Amino acid sequence: MSGGKYVDSEGHLYTVPIREQGNIYKPNNKAMAEEMNEKQVYDAHTKEIDLVNRDPKHLNDDVVKIDFEDVIAEPEGTHSFDGIWKASFTTFTVTKYWFYRLLSALFGIPMALIWGIYFAILSFLHIWAVVPCIKSFLIEIQCISRVYSIYVHTFCDPLFEAIGKIFSNIRINTQKEI
């Protein structure tokens, strides 16, 4: 560490030698990551979003894909004028498109804020209230389950075993009379 220049395995030039074990907070992380084949962790808040495919998990495939043909249809023998049909199609499609954009512009960010708060509260309650309550219940119920198990093995098992032996010798013969 005399201030000399060093070259690492990838050819990068640096002044202070890098520890082979990794940084001081995670000793052996460099060697362990290669040995354990750990994946690189990405922060969910800094990931890029896809502006083309906005439903990558196909949440709304069957619900909101409503086109003109799904709502308005004229059966054979009952047709309006072609111009009216084309104008209706255009009016429906453009109105749906721009009204959705208007609603998204007005209410999209407030609704995202509300749903973000809601799911944050839900996650918080699940992590800090629900799971600890269930774990404590399971710990507390364990002593009751032991007492119940002793009761069943002491009283119920012999009783039902005796009843089973009583009814095990019953034989039924059926005869068919003509």
Curated annotation (Swiss-Prot):
Residues 2-104, 126-178 are cytoplasmic. GO terms for biological process: caveola assembly; cell differentiation; negative regulation of canonical Wnt signaling pathway; negative regulation of endothelial cell proliferation; negative regulation of transcription by RNA polymerase II; receptor internalization; regulation of cytosolic calcium ion concentration; T cell costimulation. The modification Phosphoserine is found at residues 2, 9. The keyword Protein biosynthesis does not apply. GO terms for cellular component: caveola; cytoplasmic vesicle; endoplasmic reticulum; endosome; Golgi apparatus; Golgi membrane; membrane raft; perinuclear region of cytoplasm. The modification N-acetylserine is found at residue 2. It is found in: Golgi apparatus membrane; Cell membrane; Membrane, Caveola; Membrane raft. The keyword Ubl conjugation applies. Phosphorylated at Tyr-14 by ABL1 in response to oxidative stress. Ubiquitinated. Undergo monoubiquitination and multi- and/or polyubiquitination. Monoubiquitination of N-terminal lysines promotes integration in a ternary complex with UBXN6 and VCP which promotes oligomeric CAV1 targeting to lysosomes for degradation. Ubiquitinated by ZNRF1; leading to degradation and modulation of the TLR4-mediated immune response. Residues 82-94 are annotated as: Interaction with CAVIN3. PROSITE patterns: CAVEOLIN. The modification N6-acetyllysine is found at residue 5. Residues 105-125 dip into the membrane without crossing it. Keywords: Acetylation, Cell membrane, Golgi apparatus, Isopeptide bond, Lipoprotein, Membrane, Palmitate, Phosphoprotein, Ubl conjugation. GO terms for molecular function: ATPase binding; molecular adaptor activity; oxysterol binding; protein kinase binding; transmembrane transporter binding. There is a cross-link at residues 5, 26, 30, 39, 47, 57 (Glycyl lysine isopeptide (Lys-Gly) (interchain with G-Cter in ubiquitin)). It is a peripheral membrane protein. May act as a scaffolding protein within caveolar membranes. Forms a stable heterooligomeric complex with CAV2 that targets to lipid rafts and drives caveolae formation. Mediates the recruitment of CAVIN proteins (CAVIN1/2/3/4) to the caveolae. Interacts directly with G-protein alpha subunits and can functionally regulate their activity. Involved in the costimulatory signal essential for T-cell receptor (TCR)-mediated T-cell activation. Its binding to DPP4 induces T-cell proliferation and NF-kappa-B activation in a T-cell receptor/CD3-dependent manner. Belongs to the caveolin family. This is Caveolin-1.
